[in-house]
């Protein structure tokens, strides 16, 4: 696994014009944030060695480098899911590559529901903990 991570990171380093320390995984509903990224260059997942390819409708399947505001960032437009048949190692592979590239801060977004009656459509929720019901632990 480490060799694959290093191979993928080396490929991306050869394409990168900046050295971002912040990354965003754009989940369902936030893919349009990619339109706010300036000075961007995109790499399709299919072009990246060892990278899985998203099969979810609406996930564009691109890694985007550029600026959001004045900050150099890396963004994943589309991600991979356990329910698509990927192993947890494959699902977490991009995050491991990000770490190898020097990413220090990662924002992960998704569409979600809540049982709290005070929540309204469009509210932002910050996850402080989670329950793992997956048969395969994502941190292995």
Which residue stretches match the model-derived regions?
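Metabolite-binding pocket within alpha/beta catalytic cores that recognizes anionic/polar moieties
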Residues: 1-140
